[in-house]
Amino acid sequence: MVIKTITRFTNSFRGIPREVWLLSVVSLINRSGAMVICFLTLYLTSALHFDIKSAGYILSCFGIGSIIGAYMGGLLTDFYGYYRVQWLTLVFHGIGLWAVMFFTDFWVLCIGMTFIGMVSEAFRPANSVAIKQHSDEKTRTRSMSLMRVAVNLAISVALIGGGLLVALGWKWLFIVDGLTCFGAAAMLIFSLKEKKQISAQNPPPLREESFGQYIDSKSVDTNTRSAYRDKKYLLFIFSTFIGATVFMQIMWTVPAFFKGVYGWNEATIGAISAINGIAVMTLEMPLIFRIEHKRKPMWFVRLGILCYAVSYLAFTFPASLSWYLAVFFMICVSFGEIFVMPFSTSWATKQGSEARQGQYMALYTIAYSTSNVIAPMMGTQVIAAFGFTALWWVSAGLSAVAFLGFGYLDRIEKR
């Protein structure tokens, strides 16, 4: 039984291209230092002594920067290619983190977090296009999952390591996070070669047709419309944004809930939160390998949204069950993440033409970036006005909206 399980686990990784593995290692190195974002709410309220509302505004500035960065990242990827965009954003991300370490003023922090959000999210469209370029239809969903496994392993390291580093001083979170950005950029530059892609600087080649005439191969692409005019894709983006706003509470408000209601310290919060990353890391690839062809992607996405709703409603039960509820939440929200994110990302990469891939993936990234504006703002304001319990019910209600949106999209595809 154990051998069979191990075999299934290893089989789920077979066939994934070497370049995707390298991209995953780059993300592993980079995200292992993502301690600042994981502990940002606690840093602002505990170390800098901002109230929950002010902290929410600063967190939303990170989200605003993320939206700008996602849009610019898509444009730059289409124009310059995914390779340059990735390593440049990593370098500037590291520089930004080291600068923000010295900021204490509210408005200066807002500007600093906007910049960090920009360079952080500009990386994502380029990274998604890179995975598509180095994978095929058979391995794409698993390639996306491998990337997420790497990210979740890294987040687990960041949560546990960050909780321990806080004891040495908050500045060490920024120092280590910056170092991992520089390390990831160095590995990308020295270990991965860029694959030629269609872009503004590398237009599609002319191809010969009958009678010796040449035509631009892009002119025969039947799907070159803008992502911003693709109504079906925009419905997908809206539903993704709603679902992401629910999921992002795990980052922005759940740590504050653990500290304020359950009374846990940073090390305990980091250890409990790491369950999410460990669960995704160990379960996602084998599970995706077994189920990816069983049903259509939207079916799994809707199942994941239901898991989100159930996980947050668990917090409405008495705090005397804190340990059981926290573990249940982390496991349930992890399954939601496993069902939602790889299948939605894989679906998104199949939309639009190759020349528009940066634009399509930028819009997908913008959905998550926008949620990074709305999620902390909504969460902190609801908490301040009505308390944590109200936030969990609001999260469940938003999950229902996302569920209906993906369901309607599924019906459109069946026509």
Question: Predicted segments — roles?
Answer:
Residues 2-17, 195-237:
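Juxtamembrane intracellular "pre-TM" segments in multi-pass secondary transporters
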Residues 13-63, 234-239, 244-272:
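Helix-loop boundary and gating motifs at the non-cytosolic
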Residues 35, 63-67, 71, 155-156, ...:
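Residue-level signature of mid-helix packing/kink "hotspots" within the transmembrane helices
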Residues 49, 81, 102-107, 317-320:
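Helix-breaking motifs and short loop linkers at transmembrane-helix boundaries and internal kinks
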Residues 70-81, 166, 283-296:
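Helix-to-loop junctions at the C-terminal end of transmembrane segments
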Residues 84-98, 299-313:
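Structural signature of the two symmetry-related core transmembrane helices
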Residues 114-151:
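Cytoplasmic helix-loop-helix junction between adjacent transmembrane helices
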Residues 174-190, 392-407:
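Symmetry-related core transmembrane helices of the 12-TM Major Facilitator Superfamily/SLC fold
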